[in-house]
């Protein structure tokens, strides 16, 4: 029996390193893979292999990201590390690498720097739920009081952006010494302490299947003698024949009942997150439903027209605009399956936004869309993507 327990798949958790340039994010990433591989299995990735991050495309935006993995006693971690600051901004806004928690790396010698602040703010805006801190380069600081001071500054910064600064685990260490196999407190043991902090401070993520049902409408068909079938990919939750659902967005919310679930032309009892399914709806007419709406568990999501967003504007090289835009800019916002026109209100003191910038804005849509905080969208002009964003806060 003991053997079966050992074979059990470990819980999968997504994390990533954030923090100022040259504070040691990539060195720490390498140390995590090395010590993880030695203790719990997995593969060591050297600094150079991580630093040469391949480019990938997310929503038409090129982002350099390194993906590594390592294990703890109880979890399997998938970890992202980005070489440049711009890559972080793009990664977090597009949600290319969704994080269940982040490791904020801050040099003990330098303390919090501008990107330290910006990455914490971005984490708050895009909904990274938990942050654990690694105060790196502790071997370069002899003065214990100085370390304490830096730790206090980091805690204040976290609290300022609504993270629990006082309760956040902060581990002092040296990623470089740990990589060299140093056994002093700030070497290998510090990395093990960090992994333990990840295990305990970042709660188990809720799987998509366990969340309330939601399916964006991709297509609507009328099948004579049977009624209306709506197709799409189930984003979260489970849907069973006989369940009551709501149709939300664009127009007034309607209630209906699912009388059939189909996949690959076969009738099923239920569909779940990740499935491409067709749902047969009772008493619903072909014209009652359109692309851009969502089917959902009643009361689980509401339609909104006004929200605060964090937006990245594509540079000219990425195929974005060649010129800045100004207040009153009215592009299309592509949510899930459809474009909806909206007007942009820029922050006070911001006259224009240049290609390649990231900016906070308030958007007012001409039609309501079913949304929660954390929903990603693209900004388009005539079908061409010119930006990417995330709903930071719903206004109304």
From Swiss-Prot:
Matches recorded under NCBIfam families: EF-Tu, PRK00049.1, PRK12735.1, PRK12736.1, small_GTP
Catalytic activity: GTP + H2O = GDP + phosphate + H(+)
Pfam family, one: GTP_EFTU
Oligomer status and interactors: Monomer.
Recorded GO CC terms: cytoplasm
Region (G4): 136-139
Domain of life: Bacteria
Keyword terms, alphabetized: Cytoplasm, Elongation factor, GTP-binding, Hydrolase, Magnesium, Metal-binding, Nucleotide-binding, Protein biosynthesis
Designated name of the protein: Elongation factor Tu-B
Binding residue positions for GTP: 19-26, 81-85, 136-139
Sequence similarity: Belongs to the TRAFAC class translation factor GTPase superfamily. Classic translation factor GTPase family. EF-Tu/EF-1A subfamily.
EC number: 3.6.5.3
Function: GTP hydrolase that promotes the GTP-dependent binding of aminoacyl-tRNA to the A-site of ribosomes during protein biosynthesis.
Record-linked PANTHER family: ELONGATION FACTOR TU, MITOCHONDRIAL, ELONGATION FACTOR TU-RELATED
Region of interest: G1: 19-26
GO BP term (any one): translational elongation
Region (G2): 60-64
